[in-house]
Amino acid sequence: MAFKFKTFAAVGALIGSLALVGCGQDEKDPNHIKVGVIVGAEQQVAEVAQKVAKDKYGLDVELVTFNDYVLPNEALSKGDIDANAFQHKPYLDQQLKDRGYKLVAVGNTFVYPIAGYSKKIKSLDELQDGSQVAVPNDPTNLGRSLLLLQKVGLIKLKDGVGLLPTVLDVVENPKNLKIVELEAPQLPRSLDDAQIALAVINTTYASQIGLTPAKDGIFVEDKESPYVNLIVTREDNKDAENVKKFVQAYQSDEVYEAANKVFNGGAVKGW
């Protein structure tokens, strides 16, 4: 009986080893990749990249959707996904600094301009003294929004603040605006809040309620923006064949046409 037990144990160990090897091979399959994207319009664009990847490169792209900007990098860092496509460089740089992720950009996608939207006013001339203006609360998009508010003359920031100013850097506020920081996904809903006169919203979230910068924005970030979105992976995965194939598929004419259709001309090619 002891001999039989050892034999079965050895066979079990061998099967377990083979299973582990099989899993490792699947994870490194050059013809499969898991990519994190934000649900909504960017997901629609990624679905076109998914089709191009399959048709042109034989790559099976599994899209994993997220509802916020925090989880996609966390999932990537943990190895739950192989890449993500949702963030611009200033945001990635801040995440690397704050969280210590070993992530790297491997390709550009698009610039999706942010814009100021309102259901209360139609021009900045109508913005009343003391109005509440909603902006995203993550450091990079907060800074991006404040820089845009400065560009349209609503506030003035301290010199030399770079791309990451905060409300503490506001040195002039002629209309005594109250800057309200909210989670980015909440910004579209804030337009229905009686207290919010204006909201600065990323195109990704604005598009979820049918808003586009060119058509609906009271003011819009220009096309010279440094906030080009990226395809990001782990540092130890940057040379993987499936990552290279996905970048090639995303940077295609088909995806560019789809992005401009989905965002009504609001997508600027970044490659």
From Swiss-Prot:
Lipid attachment locations (N-palmitoyl cysteine): C23
Q: S-diacylglycerol cysteine: lipidated where?
A: C23
Q: Name one Pfam family in it.
A: Lipoprotein_9
Which subcellular locations apply to this protein?
A: Cell membrane
Top-rank lineage group of the source organism:
Bacteria
Major location category of this protein: membrane
Question: Which topology term describes how it sits in the membrane?
Answer: Lipid-anchor
Q: What GO cellular-component annotations does this UniProt entry give?
A: ATP-binding cassette (ABC) transporter complex, substrate-binding subunit-containing; membrane; methionine-importing ABC transporter complex; outer membrane-bounded periplasmic space; plasma membrane
Q: Where is the signal peptide?
A: 1-22
Q: Which GO terms describe its biological process?
A: D-methionine transmembrane transport; methionine import across plasma membrane; methionine transport
Q: Which UniProt keywords apply?
A: Amino-acid transport, Cell membrane, Lipoprotein, Membrane, Palmitate, Signal, Transport
Q: Which CDD domains match?
A: PBP2_lipoprotein_IlpA_like
What is this protein's function?
This protein is a component of a D-methionine permease, a binding protein-dependent, ATP-driven transport system.
Give the protein family. Answer: Belongs to the NlpA lipoprotein family.
**Could you share any additional remarks the record makes about this protein?**
The MetNIQ system is also to be able to transport the toxic methionine analog alpha-methyl-methionine.
Q: What protein is this chain from?
A: D-methionine-binding lipoprotein MetQ
Upper taxonomic classification of the species? Bacteria, Pseudomonadati, Pseudomonadota, Gammaproteobacteria, Enterobacterales
